[in-house]
């Protein structure tokens, strides 16, 4: 369910259903439905989205620097639709999402 929005991405490339979040959602869900109709559990990956990274996550930890609006409208959209359509298998990616680390740090801070 990765939206391939970075042409320099060394990992995703042709492993994505495209550059458009809507099209990736539709094709990914159709593929998942086809798998599950034959008794195979579908697993969507790489949550929360590995399509706009420039590093190979098998070699280093890519950093996702997008704000919440961008994450919601591009990277997370296919995963949201996948879950909404009743699918549940999701594999996380090896990614450092800056925004989430900031939020988690604030939530865990004793100075809240």
Predicted regions and their residues:
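Active-site-proximal loop motif in hydrolases
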Residues: 16
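Short, conserved phosphate-binding/catalytic loop or strand-edge motifs used
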Residues: 1-11
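Second-shell residues forming the walls of enzyme active-site clefts
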Residues: 19-112
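A generic short-segment signal for beta-strand/edge and adjacent turn/coil regions
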Residues: 11-13, 59-60
């Amino acid at each position: 369910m990765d939206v391939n929005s970075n042409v320099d991405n060394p990992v995703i490339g042709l492993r994505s259903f495209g550059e458009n979040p809507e099209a990736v959602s539709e094709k990914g869900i159709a593929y998942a439905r086809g798998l599950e109709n034959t008794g195979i559990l579908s697993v969507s990956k790489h949550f929360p989205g590995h399509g706009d990274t420039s590093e190979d996550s098998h070699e280093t930890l890519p950093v996702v620097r997008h704000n919440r609006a961008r994450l919601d409208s591009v990277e997370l959209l296919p995963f949201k639709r996948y879950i909404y359509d009743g699918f549940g298998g999701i594999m996380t990616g090896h990614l450092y999402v800056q925004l989430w680390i900031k939020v988690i740090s604030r939530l865990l801070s004793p100075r809240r």
